[in-house]
A protein has these predicted regions:
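Core subunits and conserved enzymes of cellular information-processing
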Residues: 1-84
Length: 84
Protein backbone atom coordinates (compact mmCIF):
# COMPACT_ATOMS: atom_id res chain seq x y z
CA UNK A 1 0.00 0.00 0.00
CA UNK A 2 1.27 3.46 -0.89
CA UNK A 3 1.17 6.59 1.17
CA UNK A 4 -1.53 9.18 0.69
CA UNK A 5 0.08 12.20 -0.93
CA UNK A 6 -1.29 15.70 -0.58
CA UNK A 7 -1.69 17.23 -4.04
CA UNK A 8 -0.79 20.63 -2.58
CA UNK A 9 2.74 19.32 -2.01
CA UNK A 10 3.15 19.09 -5.80
CA UNK A 11 1.36 22.22 -7.01
CA UNK A 12 2.86 25.72 -6.92
CA UNK A 13 0.19 28.16 -5.82
CA UNK A 14 0.05 31.91 -6.29
CA UNK A 15 0.74 32.44 -2.59
CA UNK A 16 3.87 30.26 -2.87
CA UNK A 17 5.33 32.50 -5.58
CA UNK A 18 4.28 35.62 -3.66
CA UNK A 19 5.95 34.28 -0.50
CA UNK A 20 9.26 33.77 -2.32
CA UNK A 21 9.09 37.24 -3.89
CA UNK A 22 8.20 38.88 -0.56
CA UNK A 23 10.99 37.06 1.27
CA UNK A 24 13.53 38.12 -1.34
CA UNK A 25 12.41 41.77 -1.06
CA UNK A 26 12.62 41.48 2.74
CA UNK A 27 16.13 40.07 2.36
CA UNK A 28 17.26 43.13 0.44
CA UNK A 29 16.78 42.12 -3.19
CA UNK A 30 17.64 45.04 -5.43
CA UNK A 31 16.27 43.51 -8.62
CA UNK A 32 14.21 40.41 -9.33
CA UNK A 33 12.83 38.40 -12.24
CA UNK A 34 10.28 35.61 -12.51
CA UNK A 35 10.91 33.76 -15.74
CA UNK A 36 11.90 36.55 -18.16
CA UNK A 37 9.76 39.25 -16.53
CA UNK A 38 11.17 41.95 -14.27
CA UNK A 39 9.38 42.04 -10.92
CA UNK A 40 8.72 45.41 -9.32
CA UNK A 41 7.41 46.11 -5.83
CA UNK A 42 3.90 46.47 -7.27
CA UNK A 43 4.00 43.59 -9.78
CA UNK A 44 1.00 41.29 -9.72
CA UNK A 45 1.62 37.55 -9.58
CA UNK A 46 -1.50 35.71 -10.74
CA UNK A 47 -1.98 31.96 -11.08
CA UNK A 48 -4.76 30.37 -13.10
CA UNK A 49 -4.59 26.65 -12.52
CA UNK A 50 -0.94 25.76 -12.92
CA UNK A 51 -0.22 28.71 -15.25
CA UNK A 52 1.47 31.85 -13.96
CA UNK A 53 0.39 35.15 -15.52
CA UNK A 54 2.96 37.94 -15.48
CA UNK A 55 2.52 41.19 -17.37
CA UNK A 56 0.14 39.59 -19.85
CA UNK A 57 2.30 36.53 -20.59
CA UNK A 58 1.55 32.94 -19.53
CA UNK A 59 4.18 30.63 -18.04
CA UNK A 60 4.01 26.95 -17.12
CA UNK A 61 6.08 25.28 -14.39
CA UNK A 62 8.82 24.97 -13.53
CA UNK A 63 9.05 28.63 -12.55
CA UNK A 64 12.39 30.40 -12.25
CA UNK A 65 12.90 33.24 -9.79
CA UNK A 66 16.18 35.14 -9.83
CA UNK A 67 17.30 38.08 -7.71
CA UNK A 68 20.24 40.43 -7.37
CA UNK A 69 21.13 41.55 -3.88
CA UNK A 70 22.89 40.50 -0.69
CA UNK A 71 23.01 36.72 -1.10
CA UNK A 72 23.37 35.78 2.57
CA UNK A 73 20.55 38.10 3.65
CA UNK A 74 18.21 36.85 0.93
CA UNK A 75 18.92 33.20 1.80
CA UNK A 76 18.33 33.98 5.47
CA UNK A 77 15.03 35.72 4.63
CA UNK A 78 13.89 32.69 2.60
CA UNK A 79 14.91 30.34 5.43
CA UNK A 80 13.18 32.50 8.07
CA UNK A 81 9.91 32.87 6.16
CA UNK A 82 7.12 30.67 7.48
CA UNK A 83 5.39 30.97 4.10
CA UNK A 84 8.26 29.61 1.99
Amino acid sequence: SGSAANINDYVVHQEDVEAVVNALWAGGAESMMIMDQRVLFNSAVICQGNVLLLQGKKYSPPFTVSAIGPTDAMIRALDDSNAV
